[in-house]
Design a protein with these regions (language model features):
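Thiamine diphosphate
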Residues: 1-23, 177, 183-186, 191-195, 205, 376-469, 474-477, ...
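Active-site diphosphate/adenylate-binding microenvironment
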Residues: 264-347
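Short glycine-enriched loops at secondary-structure junctions
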Residues: 32, 82-83, 216, 307-312, ...
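N-terminal alpha/beta PP-like core and its mobile active-site loop of ThDP/TPP-dependent enzymes
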Residues: 1-249, 254, 293, 297-300, ...
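Hydrophobic, well-ordered secondary-structure elements that form the walls
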Residues: 210, 294, 306, 345, ...
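A general structural motif
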Residues: 28-30, 103-116, 285-286, 308-311, ...
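Flexible, glycine/charged-enriched surface loops at secondary-structure junctions
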Residues: 72-76, 248-266, 453-457
């Protein structure tokens, strides 16, 4: 159920099909008889049961269609055993045709709002655009990139949108989002809600013109007022805006060179301040060093997955995916244990790509044995663990509130040599305690996965007394 809830908060269009006891045994106590439809209803866009064999295909199409109606999300469909097993005449079955069971969702909303947004951006001196998960989910990234480049606007990415621009792109910005939002005169938020990751909308400049674009009308203007709200397909909207500006002689692109140069200088300064952490040679290993080494290891075909608390927060500062679709994390729900499932799915969907999942030791323990599942299905991957022998993000808050005596209750995990998991399954495992061995260990894991077809586990022992700044500030609660 946590996986379904993760799909809901991450706006992932996943169709879940579950079983049920025979309808003839309803309420008789049949095997695993539970109200699955009712349980799934609050965490899906659509939850229903099939009551007729003739309707199975039709109901599947309805559930799939709901996954893509408005903002994407999960559906749940229950098929009782006798409904599934019964044979019926094919002429009595409703079978929707592929490609014809749902309408296009590339709506741009009110054309007048497109004109308003185009005018705002053209006149803006210091615009900033944040591209969220929806931009990648609905495959609107090319249109988004076109707008950034066409109008010379700095772009920031969060969630699954990370990687839409390569790190060396002149319109890619990473560390200066807070700076841009404090100084920008126009801020456009595309496909991401004002949730805890965005400070519920409170971190934007108070007098800035704020525009929000989203596929779900319920998300627009939630948690804060905006100057202009557009409901529709992010890619279609951004393309329509760019099309309007092509007829304008001065779209402001040249005027904004100084604005981008200013942000670039701050980016450089902030990166330089982080370098001592990224290059730290401390013992135990600093978690920032691990994230930096992983970033240096990635290539254009590596799908990076973060599964944990602090490891995700820290890696978001260091890891810069090289291509669209190459970043996955627990999403807005923030639940641990997603990594192995994400890695398995990524390997099956993109068998020619390399998959690397960076876990905390707490999250790795939740799904470690499914590495065998990944191997069995031909989807081996590289598992890297930042092991501090604790549920450390939770531990920080507990220590701060209750002190050493009571703060360590339930969050210390012990020293586990997780590399043994890979070895017992026929893959490569290595324990790393020297920061200079991180890179070589990752290379050995890569070579082993390629040559042996089994997942590799690199267990890196990190300092439990180091935390991400967001953890120290407890920003997830503010």
């Amino acid at each position: 159920m946590t996986g379904i809830a993760t799909a809901l908060r991450s706006e992932s269009p996943v169709l879940h099909i579950g079983g049920q006891g025979a309808m003839t045994q309803h309420k008789m106590g049949s095997l695993q008889d539970l109200p699955h439809v009712d349980i799934a209803a609050p965490i899906t866009k659509f939850s229903a049961g099939v009551r007729s064999t003739e309707r199975i295909a039709d109901m599947i199409s309805i559930a799939a269609r709901e996954c893509f109606a408005g903002a994407p999300g999960p559906s749940y469909l229950e098929i009782p055993r006798d409904v599934l097993d019964r044979e019926v005449a094919v002429n009595d079955v409703i079978i929707p045709e592929p490609g014809r069971y749902r309408a296009s969702t590339r709506s741009i909303g009110d054309p007048a709002d497109i004109e308003k947004l185009a005018s705002l951006l053209v006149k803006s001196e210091r615009p900033a655009i944040l591209l969220g998960t929806q931009v990648w989910t609905c495959r609107g990234h090319e249109e988004a990139i076109g707008l950034l480049r066409g109008l010379n606007i700095p772009g920031y990415m969060n969630g699954s949108a990370r990687g839409l621009l390569p790190p060396d792109d002149p319109h890619y910005f990473h560390r200066t989002r807070a700076d841009a939002f404090k100084k920008a005169d126009v801020i456009v938020i595309v496909g991401t809600p004002f949730d805890f990751r965005m400070g519920y909308g409170k971190r934007l400049r108070a007098d800035a013109t704020v525009v929000q674009i989203d596929m779900d009308y319920r998300t627009v203007v939630k948690n804060r007022d905006v100057s202009l709200g557009l409901v529709g397909h992010p890619g279609a909207i951004l393309k329509a805006v760019l099309d309007v500006t092509t007829d304008i002689a001065d779209n402001g692109a040249k005027r904004r060179r100084g604005w981008l140069e200013q942000l670039r200088a701050i980016e450089k300064e902030k990166t330089e301040k982080l370098m001592p952490l990224f290059k730290s040679d401390s013992i135990p290993i600093h978690p920032y060093r691990v994230a930096w080494e992983i970033n240096e290891f990635l290539n254009e075909d590596t799908i990076y997955i973060g599964d944990g608390g602090d490891v995700v927060t820290i890696s978001a500062q260091a890891v810069q995916p090289r291509a669209p679709g190459n970043w996955m994390d627990p999403g807005a729900l923030g639940g641990l244990g997603v990594g192995t499932g994400f890695a398995l799915a990524s390997g099956l969907a993109h068998p020619k790509k390399e998959v690397l999942c960076y876990y905390g030791d707490g999250s790795f323990g939740m799904t470690a044995f499914d590495i065998e599942t990944a191997n069995r299905f031909g989807a081996p991957f590289i598992a890297v663990i930042g092991n501090n022998s604790a549920m450390n993000q939770i531990r920080y808050g507990q220590l701060a509130k209750y002190g050493e005596e009571r703060g360590n209750v339930g969050n210390l995990l012990g020293d586990v040599p997780f590399s043994k998991f890979a070895e017992m399954l026929g893959g490569y495992g290595e324990e790393v305690r020297d920061c200079n061995e991180i890179g070589p260990a990752l290379q050995r894991a890569r070579e082993s996965v390629k040559s042996g077809g089994k997942s590799a586990v690199i267990n890196i022992w990190v300092d439990p007394s180091e935390w991400a700044p967001g953890t120290k500030r407890q920003t997830m609660y503010k």
